[in-house]
């Protein structure tokens, strides 16, 4: 069997593997840990007399375990689902900051979070 077709085939395989590795690496980079608060939107006005819902989606990454919910820096909830909603207790009127933070198994924030500022009337 001639050696030239084998070398050509080997080069094609090597390029395919290299391209696949680059695509895999790019896909892995796209899956960075994140928190996304889908509702309420930043700047929204919430009704103080209603139960308001915080809708979220999280990828905790390899260092994260679950998430905590904060209102004005005070922890108000622990969430184990990566996607869902959380009913906020009655909020007093004024400007409020709602945060979802990824924490590790020791309940320590790992720096992956999102916060939104809202107005409660």
Describe each PLM feature range:
Residues 84-86:
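Short strand-edge motifs at loop-to-beta-strand transitions and within beta-strands
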Residues 104-111:
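Short acidic/polar inter-strand loop motif in beta-rich domains
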Residues 66-70:
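Beta-strand signatures of extracellular beta-sandwich domains
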Residues 76-82:
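Short beta-strand segments within Ig-like beta-sandwich modules, predominantly Fibronectin type-III
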Residues 53-60:
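Aromatic/hydrophobic beta-strand junction motif of beta-rich domains
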